[in-house]
Amino acid sequence: KISNFPVIFIDADMRIGKPRMDNELMDHANGKFLIWNDSDDFLLPDAIDKLVGLWNNIPNERNNEYLGVMALCSDDNGVMQTLGYGNNKSILDTTFRQLTADHIGDSTVMIRSDLVNNKKFLEVDFLITESCFWQPIFSDLKVILLSDVVKIMDRTAPGSISFGKKMEYNRGKAYAISISDTGYHFSRLDLIKKLWKVTNYWRYSLLGEVGFLKSIGMWSVVSRNPLYLLLYPAGGLLALRDIIKGKVVMTHRDFDHANKSVKMTVTNY
């Protein structure tokens, strides 16, 4: 079907992963806003109208205070995926830092494209959580959350990585923790969750083959508190258990190879 607007098709001759493709997308995007919609998700017919309408309600003189607008997601069984805000019945106007402190899960995000000019997702694995991209850029900006579901996510789609049983993307997980779970967000965790977060960080770092000294320097939480180094053996035991159970997939190795060898093509329609 021929669209009534320009389409840019970006293709790779091998699997290259979401961060690399997202970076290519942002390099070629030329609209006022960016919105992400993965291949196993779909926007409802009025989604764009609702999001743009929400943005247009912000006075022009205050646009620079906001990163954009957000809305809720559910799966195809009606189960809310934007955890923490599923019962919210009104529009919420808050800071991105506060929103993400209370928000776990997925949401529909429409952001100002000018905010991500020359910004890049970390290319360290086939997958890295989007929060490690959002947090450094958006934390001090405001966002408006619409209480409507505008996107349906298919969690049963072939190849879905949302709930895989393998230990994959470990390097990406380690980097994501080091960027996202700092300062304000880490301080809000209770003691048990803090200990579990640090233990898993060591686990992911080991499985992702991030060197010991580098993993310390990457995350301010462990570099500033040497006591967290005592949890390194616990992370090592979990990593060893994962290996013995045959759960570990070294996706970062495949990514490193693909990132050096891939050929990208960009076609304008």
PLM feature spans:
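Short aromatic/hydrophobic "clamp" motif used to bind/position activated sugar donors
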Residues: L34
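Conserved nucleotide-sugar donor-binding catalytic segment
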Residues: T82-G164
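C-terminal subregions of glycosyltransferases and related glycan-biosynthesis enzymes
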Residues: S147-Y269
